[in-house]
Amino acid sequence: MDPKLLLCLPQGDELFNPLNTMFIQMACILVFSQLFYLLLKPCGQAGPVAQILAGIVLSPVLLSRIPKVKEFFLQKNAADYYSFFSFALRTSFMFLIGLEVDLHFMRRNFKKAAVITLSSFVVSGLLSFASLMLFIPLFGIKEDYFTFFLVLLVTLSNTASPVVVRSIADWKLNTCEIGRLTISCALFIELTNVVLYTIIMAFISGTIILELFLFLLATVALILINMVLAPWLPKRNPKEKYLSKAETLVFFIFLLIIGITIESYDVNSSVSVFAIGIMFPRQGKTHRTLIQRLSYPIHEFVLPVYFGYIGFRFSIIALTKRFYLGIVIIVIVTIAGKFIGVISACMYLKIPKKYWLFLPTILSVKGHVGLLLLDSNYSEKKWWTTTIHDMMVAALVITTLVSGVLASFLLKTREKDFAYEKTSLESHNTNEELRILSCAYGVRHARGAISLVSALSGSRGASDPFTPLLMHLVPLPKKRKSELMYHEHDEDGGNANGDDEFGTNEGLEINDSIDSFAKDSKILIQQVKLVTQMLNMHEEICNATEDLRVSIVFLPFHKHQRIDGKTTNDGELFRQMNRNVLRHGPCSIGIFVDRNITGFQQPHGFDSVQHVATLFFGGPDDREALALCRWLANNTLIHLTVIQFVSEESKAETPVGNAMTRDNNEVFMEVLGRNQTEQETDRSFLEEFYNRFVTTGQVGFIEKLVSNGPHTLTILREIGEMYSLFVVGKSTGDCPMTVRMKDWEECPELGTVGDFLASSLDVNASVLVVQRQRHSHDSFIDD
């Protein structure tokens, strides 16, 4: 293509060159896709379906069937422009997918994804071979059956990972187990197809083996360069929250150079670009900048245009009856292959039956590598005609639309199967992924949240299921715009100044604290920013809790400890926000009273073992607090002690301790439940915890016999200096051991015991008050 035509108008009477018409086409796709999305969203349809339909509207089937429109959109040399910009769009979103992919989840579920990929590929291959027997006489193919079989195999077995990623995100399944497994399978299937096809074609041609080796070296070299640049660039401007736009451009230029070089040899660059993204260093300012700068334009502009271009390729005008039959066969074989292969793998892997229909349906979508392979140069193959090409493209588009509609229908009709379930810790197995969300207004709260993350992470390897998230809460003044347009952001990509009323540039200090912790502990904390008015903040937190599917949310207490050891009130608005979250929270809630000077310190980097105590009076909140301590017990830098309080009135009853063997001769107290069922639940849970952790020596166990509330206060004062952190449930009900303690209660949101520990001058430890999930987040009452 003549470079002069890229930016200049053609000579003659034409008003527009292909570049201009392409941009107009992109604008039309965005407009139509928004209209379709508004119409289809109430039905549960994902964005890609609406965007493909927008492309079909502009395709030769509809608007481009009009001669003037066709002449406008499909000009001379237009194919070259479409090819180049398709490459640029593809490079950007494959790199972003690599940056965003959950590596820890993919490692943990590698076997599942690999088995599903293999099973799907094998079944699709067998059905492709059977279909080949039909297509050879149907289309009169007389030579080179193997190449046609390869094209058919890769086309039918492929899954378009960008369509899957975007659909899963629209359905808000990208934080749940099945959603991330679907994304992993889609990536495995697509990358396997690309690698297999490239290798086979290389051996057939015998001309690009050396080039493939050089491309591999170039990809590895860029990965190594990124590993050097990623930590070095932030040091140039340590006071900036993000890298500059010029520095960001450096990474993208390197990426385009590699991609263009590979594509110039007719080799697909998707694998290399994705590998560069997935191997990019995940911690630090550079990764955070790339995610922040690329996410919005790619999700809102690049992907819609790319999906629209898939629909624009749809053309069935020139097809005859036998090719329509071919479309039907391809659609049926594609979906059947995915269903048989994926369901067989699900049976082998013992994946719950409720996901058996959804997985193969969404994995049947096409449109990425399939189209690239169909656009390859088969000019020397006599069987490869424009009609066969249009038939294959039409089949892929129809398959994607059918699969997308069916998947959304399954989600709509079986919504409970995909609902947010792990809302409490009591029934949460420690082998399952623990997702926690810590909220922070400023760097002081962030450091306390990091301490909790450090404690709960235990002595784990990178493959263990633990996902911490930190939400930076920025209260918005009433008269300030709650949302800024993308072009209204500053150079850092954030708000006007990134500040809040707790101090200057809190966001930068929070980032630095998280980066420092990640560097020392190798634990990555995902960051979320919430900018909203204080009166609505509790609702936004609850919405985010459901979207992120966390099991417990940690909120900062509305008071903080000063350097002199005294406490200062940060404001009643923050206290009221905590109360609202406790009232409406869709999962368990913890309020962290951080005495960072005299209390709990971050275990990672701390020289000595810290002593932590959990106080057990009985009831669902205390069981939830004890359940949380199962993760604390796995941390070798923490010595955990369970202190159970038993009323003297229940001493005559059969104590829980009689069912346990223990060497400790201190007084052991019985749980006084509000009813027999509650007592049995407490007893059963405590015995299970005792047998698992106490008998093995991981956790200490003490019984305290008390008569009333004042006696309990005396014991709490005695142990106040012995521990750096107390973990306690919020509510003890009408327990006689806390009677008359409410007379001195200052903060009811902490519960009777938690309020005393947080306000007493005799206690210097930090306090974590836990409330079990009580309400479903369906609606909010005006507080």
From Swiss-Prot:
Specifically expressed in pollen. The chain crosses the membrane at residues 19-39, 43-63, 81-101, 121-141, 145-165, 186-206, 208-228, 242-262, 300-320, 323-343, 355-375, 391-411. One of its GO terms (molecular function) is antiporter activity. It is found in: Membrane. It comes from Arabidopsis thaliana. GO terms for cellular component: membrane. It comes from the Eukaryota. May operate as a cation/H(+) antiporter. InterPro entries: Cation/H_exchanger_TM (IPR006153), CPA2_transporter (IPR050794), Na+/solute_symporter_sf (IPR038770). Pfam families: CHX17_2nd, CHX17_C, Na_H_Exchanger. The keyword Protein biosynthesis does not apply. This is Cation/H(+) antiporter 2. Gene3D superfamilies: 1.20.1530.20. Belongs to the monovalent cation:proton antiporter 2 (CPA2) transporter (TC 2.A.37) family. CHX (TC 2.A.37.4) subfamily. Keywords: Antiport, Ion transport, Membrane, Potassium, Potassium transport, Transmembrane, Transmembrane helix, Transport. It is a multi-pass membrane protein. One of its GO terms (biological process) is potassium ion transport.
